[in-house]
């Protein structure tokens, strides 16, 4: 059994964390994210080209101011018609560059979301039951929906800002150094304190981002619970309680979000203030006679304009730290899930099973030390029907999960037709076991697709129709608007409980497996439907090994043998008549059933 997946914690270490030099875990996460971008190198190249064009126009805007100012001072009329044309062309070229950069960044971003989301979903399909036992459904869905979107901030949105504004800063700084390198060196003086501010903010962003992820998982979890249990909520008047619970977790999310806003609201102005101080010193020095006498008015205006144009990209580069840390936190969460051990398949055999089952000294202990089965022994002949009865928690469902290898034994051996169950491939094993659960699972698709589900999709319409007839579902299906092609809605809630159960039985009948497991398959049916379904089940159970988990003992009197479970062991075993003569556990339960 795999190690249970641990949900994200809002706590984070205050150890080494830097926006400039990423610590090893953060660097590893970022490099892993960037690896997803390799197939889109051509789009990134076009993005760089576009933003390089955009950065180049920033220089020419500053340079154009020099030419215009000098032309005005010199009263040069020869270029009067040229400047408007240059202005229009500059902004046209700038627009082309921005389009290339923005479009191809978005293309990479949306494809990354698609690939990550599909990879996470496919990973969920391969994870063992222990993962789902350890994690609420809302937390899992939050990773698939919220965290994947957040990851794009680290890999594409941040990349866009770094390329666009980074190239702009490089271009402008190059222009400033070329124009007057002595004055420009003053701007580098404020670089260390700016990097220190970004480093401090980086630590806080990462911590708060993990907190937001945790609270979003709580929001999704509560929402899923209320939606799935809306009938209980309404029937027991739980609206106020659920509203309060949702409000509390939403407020936690709000507080975490506002803390990020506060951090960003302090971080950005602080960086801008340092830039303003540097700019003020540059202007003060530039206006000194020793400096200004050596340059023209146009050169002065051009230099100051270029220095002023630095403000916006520097601010954006400061803000990108927030996006980057948020994305890295989400990336750590997603990669932790993707690195989870998958359901182990040790099987190498794909036999055609007859249905002989042997359980030899089976024990099953859950991670919380709960003992579900202890030294459990049972031999089931091929074609035999064995009913499992007992109080809730006696180990009936655990036994079924062991047979499908949804769970693994703690000790002991299970064999099918004399072969250890671990030696049979999971796909082969599960293809030869049909199940009808008490909790019916239907999907938001057509009646036909719900019966011919998964590996049964190749079944013909005639086979599906026959299975429905055997389950006494054909008549109500034909009364639906589009017959077998009718949509049944989410979880089949448009159908009655009996109708939903009959579709589930039809699915099991269509599978035609040598081993059949019925978890109180008639529990949701009315008396008349139960009579016909029981007859259909009697037919399908013939010549098949059948395990029946029974809650109403009147439904399993005809079983070949009845095993009474208590405390994870068999305390009584025999036919209905034999067990009644013992006047033990079974007889007492049977009497209570009638009462």
From Swiss-Prot:
<comment type="subunit">
    <text>Homodimer.</text>
</comment>
<dbReference type="GO" id="GO:0034040">
    <property type="term" value="F:ATPase-coupled lipid transmembrane transporter activity"/>
</dbReference>
<dbReference type="GO" id="GO:0005524">
    <property type="term" value="F:ATP binding"/>
</dbReference>
<dbReference type="GO" id="GO:0015421">
    <property type="term" value="F:ABC-type oligopeptide transporter activity"/>
</dbReference>
<feature type="transmembrane region" description="Helical">
    <location>
        <begin position="266"/>
        <end position="286"/>
    </location>
</feature>
<dbReference type="Pfam" id="PF00664">
    <property type="entry name" value="ABC_membrane"/>
</dbReference>
<dbReference type="GO" id="GO:0016887">
    <property type="term" value="F:ATP hydrolysis activity"/>
</dbReference>
<dbReference type="InterPro" id="IPR039421">
    <property type="entry name" value="Type_1_exporter"/>
</dbReference>
<keyword id="KW-0547">Nucleotide-binding</keyword>
<dbReference type="InterPro" id="IPR011917">
    <property type="entry name" value="ABC_transpr_lipidA"/>
</dbReference>
<dbReference type="InterPro" id="IPR003593">
    <property type="entry name" value="AAA+_ATPase"/>
</dbReference>
<keyword id="KW-0813">Transport</keyword>
<feature type="compositionally biased region" description="Low complexity">
    <location>
        <begin position="9"/>
        <end position="19"/>
    </location>
</feature>
<keyword id="KW-0997">Cell inner membrane</keyword>
<keyword id="KW-1133">Transmembrane helix</keyword>
<feature type="transmembrane region" description="Helical">
    <location>
        <begin position="41"/>
        <end position="61"/>
    </location>
</feature>
<dbReference type="InterPro" id="IPR036640">
    <property type="entry name" value="ABC1_TM_sf"/>
</dbReference>
<keyword id="KW-1003">Cell membrane</keyword>
<feature type="transmembrane region" description="Helical">
    <location>
        <begin position="81"/>
        <end position="101"/>
    </location>
</feature>
<dbReference type="InterPro" id="IPR003439">
    <property type="entry name" value="ABC_transporter-like_ATP-bd"/>
</dbReference>
<feature type="region of interest" description="Disordered">
    <location>
        <begin position="1"/>
        <end position="20"/>
    </location>
</feature>
<dbReference type="GO" id="GO:0005886">
    <property type="term" value="C:plasma membrane"/>
</dbReference>
<feature type="domain" description="ABC transmembrane type-1">
    <location>
        <begin position="45"/>
        <end position="326"/>
    </location>
</feature>
<keyword id="KW-0067">ATP-binding</keyword>
<keyword id="KW-0445">Lipid transport</keyword>
<dbReference type="InterPro" id="IPR027417">
    <property type="entry name" value="P-loop_NTPase"/>
</dbReference>
<dbReference type="Pfam" id="PF00005">
    <property type="entry name" value="ABC_tran"/>
</dbReference>
<comment type="similarity">
    <text>Belongs to the ABC transporter superfamily. Lipid exporter (TC 3.A.1.106) family.</text>
</comment>
<keyword id="KW-1278">Translocase</keyword>
<dbReference type="InterPro" id="IPR011527">
    <property type="entry name" value="ABC1_TM_dom"/>
</dbReference>
<feature type="domain" description="ABC transporter">
    <location>
        <begin position="357"/>
        <end position="592"/>
    </location>
</feature>
<protein>
    <recommendedName>
        <fullName>ATP-dependent lipid A-core flippase</fullName>
        <ecNumber>7.5.2.6</ecNumber>
    </recommendedName>
</protein>
<feature type="binding site">
    <location>
        <begin position="390"/>
        <end position="397"/>
    </location>
    <ligand>
        <name>ATP</name>
    </ligand>
</feature>
<feature type="transmembrane region" description="Helical">
    <location>
        <begin position="169"/>
        <end position="189"/>
    </location>
</feature>
<comment type="function">
    <text>Involved in lipopolysaccharide (LPS) biosynthesis. Translocates lipid A-core from the inner to the outer leaflet of the inner membrane. Transmembrane domains (TMD) form a pore in the inner membrane and the ATP-binding domain (NBD) is responsible for energy generation.</text>
</comment>
<keyword id="KW-0472">Membrane</keyword>
<keyword id="KW-0812">Transmembrane</keyword>
<dbReference type="InterPro" id="IPR017871">
    <property type="entry name" value="ABC_transporter-like_CS"/>
</dbReference>
């Amino acid at each position: 059994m795999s190690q249970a997946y641990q949900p994200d914690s809002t706590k984070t270490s205050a150890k080494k964390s830097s926006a400039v030099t990423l610590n090893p875990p953060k660097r590893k996460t970022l490099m892993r994210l960037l690896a997803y971008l390799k197939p889109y190198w051509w789009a990134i190249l076009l993005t760089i080209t576009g933003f390089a064009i955009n950065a180049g126009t920033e220089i020419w805007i500053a340079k154009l101011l020099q030419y215009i100012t000098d032309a005005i001072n010199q009263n040069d009329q020869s270029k009067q018609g040229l400047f408007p044309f240059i202005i229009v062309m500059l902004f046209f070229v700038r627009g082309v560059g921005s389009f290339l950069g923005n479009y191809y960044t978005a293309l990479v971003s949306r494809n990354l979301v698609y690939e990550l989301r599909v990879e996470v979903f496919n990973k969920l399909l391969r994870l063992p039951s222990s993962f789902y036992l350890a994690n609420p459904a809302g937390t899992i869905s939050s990773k698939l929906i919220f965290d994947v979107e957040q990851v794009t901030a680290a890999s594409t949105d941040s990349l866009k800002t770094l390329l666009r504004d980074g190239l702009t800063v490089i271009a402008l700084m190059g222009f400033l150094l070329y124009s007057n390198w002595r004055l420009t060196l003053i701007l580098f003086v404020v670089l260390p304190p700016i990097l220190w501010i970004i480093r401090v903010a980086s630590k806080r962003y990462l911590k708060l981002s993990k907190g937001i992820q945790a609270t979003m998982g709580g929001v999704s979890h509560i929402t899923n619970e209320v939606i799935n249990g809306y009938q209980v909520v309404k029937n027991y008047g739980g609206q106020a309680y659920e509203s309060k619970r949702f409000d509390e977790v939403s407020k936690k999310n709000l507080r975490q979000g506002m803390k990020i806003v506060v951090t960003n609201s302090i971080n950005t102005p602080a960086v801008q203030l340092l830039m303003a101080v540097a700019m003020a010193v540059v202007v003060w020095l530039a206006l000194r006679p020793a400096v200004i006498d050596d340059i023209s008015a146009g050169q002065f205006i051009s230099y100051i304009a270029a220095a002023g144009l630095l403000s916006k990209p520097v601010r954006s580069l400061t803000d990108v730290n927030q996006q980057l840390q948020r994305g890295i936190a989400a990336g750590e969460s997603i990669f932790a899930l993707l690195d989870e051990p998958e359901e182990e398949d040790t099987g190498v055999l794909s036999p055609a099973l007859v249905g002989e089952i042997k359980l030899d000294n089976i024990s099953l202990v859950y991670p919380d030390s709960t003992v579900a089965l202890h030294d459990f022994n049972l031999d089931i002949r091929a074609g035999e029907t064995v009913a499992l009865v007992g109080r809730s928690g006696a180990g009936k469902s655990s036994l079924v999960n062991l047979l499908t290898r949804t769970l693994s034994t703690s000790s002991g051996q299970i064999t099918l037709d004399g072969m250890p169950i671990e030696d049979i491939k999971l796909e082969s094993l599960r293809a030869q076991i049909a199940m009808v659960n008490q909790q019916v699972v239907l999907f938001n698709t057509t009646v036909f697709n719900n019966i011919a589900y998964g590996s049964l999709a190749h079944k013909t319409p005639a086979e599906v129709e026959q299975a429905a007839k055997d389950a006494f579902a054909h008549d109500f299906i034909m009364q639906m608007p589009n017959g077998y092609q009718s949509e049944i809605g989410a979880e089949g809630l448009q159908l009655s409980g009996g109708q939903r159960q009959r579709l589930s039985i039809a699915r099991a009948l269509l599978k035609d497996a040598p081993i059949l497991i019925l978890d109180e398959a008639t529990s949701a049916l009315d008396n008349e439907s139960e009579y016909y379904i029981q007859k259909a089940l009697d037919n399908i159970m013939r010549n098949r090994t059948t395990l029946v988990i029974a809650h109403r003992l009147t439904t399993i009197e005809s079983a070949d043998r009845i095993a009474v479970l208590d405390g994870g062991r068999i305390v009584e075993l025999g036919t209905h008549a034999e067990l009644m003569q013992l006047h033990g556990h079974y007889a007492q339960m049977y009497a209570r059933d009638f009462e």
